[in-house]
């Protein structure tokens, strides 16, 4: 079993990408069997398996910080950081906590339990890294339900002013935010996250700016046209209007695609929401 090869953090990086669906199924089977005996949060964890796997594949713990809002969906995170054997005593006295707990593992960056706090904590970590000079990535995972909390929007407002990488993952389980569908949206999402698109956009801008007189005007009009199209086609413009780059939407059960998106997100010099 692939799951038996996961003994500590970052072991998932050794798993071939084509084997990720197998590992995801093994994790779900383990959760179903284990939680049927101990109880615990089942549905939220079954829905976040691939998301967690992709984050652990792209980022390096405990150096990088993953902050889970509420934290009840962190069971796969605990499994991938070497705590699988502790599930036999999950949520029992002296046993494994049902939420992230810093004293339990250095891979738990923040003690959670209440909702809408993860983005604020992430902003704090980013600011702390700037003060200390430490280099690490910060990821805040928040659900659409928790995003309704006012504290989350205050944090988004503060995050927009950061000039350092900060990844916010919106885990939309369709309980509060309507699903986005359509080939145009998927196409634009793929296009915007491709390095070739980013490079081409930069070259076109440089070339047009060299045109005497009308060059800068053409660049400005192209930007306005592009933004108008994005407003119609891409749901994340709300975040972009706040100054936070948006990448998505992404199928939360497509581990390979999420790995690709997170690899692009960690290169952004500033806040980015997936």
Question: Residue locations for each model-derived region?
Answer:
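Cofactor-binding active-site loop characterized by glycine-rich and histidine/acidic residues
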Residues: 41-162
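Active-site flanking residues adjacent to catalytic metal/cofactor-binding acidic residues
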Residues: 68, 143, 170-171, 274
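Long, well-ordered, tryptophan-enriched scaffold segments
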Residues: 174-273
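Gly-rich Lys/Arg/Thr-decorated short loops/hinges at beta-loop-alpha junctions or inter-strand turns
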Residues: 2-8, 30-34, 96-109, 136, ...
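Acidic active-site catalytic centers that drive phospho-/nucleotidyl reactions
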Residues: 11-14, 144, 172
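A short alpha/beta connector and helix-capping loop motif
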Residues: 149-171, 181, 185-194
């Amino acid at each position: 079993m692939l799951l038996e090869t996961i003994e500590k953090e970052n072991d998932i990086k050794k798993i071939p990408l084509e084997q990720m669906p197998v590992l995801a199924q093994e994790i779900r089977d383990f959760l179903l069997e284990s939680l049927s005996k101990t109880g615990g949060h089942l549905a939220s964890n079954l829905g976040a398996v691939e998301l967690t796997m992709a984050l652990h594949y792209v980022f390096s713990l405990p150096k990088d910080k993953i902050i889970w809002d509420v934290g009840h969906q962190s069971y796969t995170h605990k499994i991938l950081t070497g705590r699988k054997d502790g599930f036999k005593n999950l949520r029992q006295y002296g046993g494994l906590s049902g939420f992230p707990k810093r004293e339990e593992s250095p891979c738990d960056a923040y003690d959670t339990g209440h909702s809408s706090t993860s983005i604020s904590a992430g902003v704090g970590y980013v600011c702390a890294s700037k003060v200390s000079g430490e280099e690490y990535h910060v990821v805040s995972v928040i659900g659409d339900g928790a995003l309704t909390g006012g504290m989350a929007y205050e944090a988004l407002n503060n995050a927009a002013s950061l000039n350092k990488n900060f990844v916010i993952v919106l885990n939309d389980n369709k309980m509060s935010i309507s699903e986005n569908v359509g080939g145009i949206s998927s196409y634009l999402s793929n296009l915007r996250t491709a390095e070739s698109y980013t490079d081409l956009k930069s070259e076109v801008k440089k070339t047009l700016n060299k045109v005497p007189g009308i060059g800068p005007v053409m660049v400005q009009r192209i930007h306005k046209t592009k933004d108008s199209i994005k407003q119609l086609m891409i749901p994340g413009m709300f975040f972009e209007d706040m100054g936070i780059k948006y990448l998505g939407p992404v199928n939360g059960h497509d581990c390979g695609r999420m790995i690709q998106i997170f690899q692009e997100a960690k290169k952004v010099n500033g806040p980015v929401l997936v």
